[in-house]
UniProtKB/Swiss-Prot annotation:
The gene is Dd. Pfam families: NIF. This is CTD nuclear envelope phosphatase 1 homolog. SUPFAM superfamilies: HAD-like. Residues 56-223 form the FCP1 homology domain. It is found in: Membrane.
Length: 243
């Protein structure tokens, strides 16, 4: 009799645990949806005649964007989810075949990434440069682009330079004029040869309250008016972590 009651009690606990997990999942999904689509804080105003004239005097610049931990975070079905809180919903999945094995990646978009891409694509020519394999990076970039044709130029692991177990990214291979190209990347080692052409950003994994991309918009808005991006970005070297 006692053992039967214990079994029923355990079954009840298991059921309650599953219900609680489901509730947490739905709550987190609603929170993320609210944060992603709430009114954005950075307002865009029409340029004044003076600003339009100034912009006409400088060349349009190229903004290079990293993917993992900069715009998105992902984990695959064979990898522990240590970086993502239980119950955190993913935004989309990517299915690829690696070494003849099917792998499914669960991808989380950094908060406000869609709005960020919409805005900066009006100011810059965008380029994706990731140290990930092309089969994965291309699929993620397709999802982020979402038919807008703003992420057409892409560079992958084969375009990187191996460097003591990591990869560096050669910006001069994208644009020979370093006056008008810069990268946003969470890994300082990736742009170690071009510190004056880089904006560091904190690595992102799953924080739904993150606003790093929004915080960059005022600076990016102003940077497009400069003759040489290095004249501004060289002053921020103290922000880069040591590598």
């Amino acid at each position: 009799m006692i053992s039967l009651l214990q079994m029923k009690f355990r079954a009840l606990l298991l059921l309650l645990s599953k219900v609680w997990t489901c509730i947490c999942f739905m709550f987190n999904r609603q929170v993320r949806a609210f944060i992603q689509y709430q009114p954005v804080k950075y307002e865009l105003f029409p340029l004044s005649p003076v600003s339009r004239h100034r912009l006409s005097l400088v060349q349009r610049k190229t903004l290079v964007l990293d993917l993992d931990e900069t715009l998105i975070h992902s984990h695959h079905n064979a990898m522990p989810r240590n970086t993502v809180k239980p119950g955190t919903p993913h935004d989309f999945t990517v299915k690829v075949t690696i070494d003849r094995n099917p792998v499914r990646f669960f991808v989380h978009k950094r908060p406000h990434v869609d709005y960020f891409l919409d805005v900066v694509s009006q100011w810059y020519d965008l380029v994706v440069f990731t140290a990930s394999m092309e089969i994965y990076g291309a699929a993620v970039a397709d999802k982020l682009d979402n038919g807008r044709n703003i992420l057409r130029r892409r560079y992958y692991r084969q375009h990187c330079t191996p460097d003591y177990g990591s990869y560096t990214k050669d910006l001069s291979a994208i644009c020979s004029d370093l006056n008008r190209i810069f990268i946003i990347d969470n890994s300082p080692g990736a742009y170690r040869c071009f510190p004056n052409n880089a904006i560091p950003i904190k690595s992102w994994f799953s924080d739904p309250m993150d606003t790093a991309l929004l915080s960059l918009l005022p600076m990016l808005d102003a940077l497009r008016f400069t003759n040489d991006v290095r004249s501004v970005l060289s002053r921020n070297l103290h922000l880069h972590r040591l590598w």
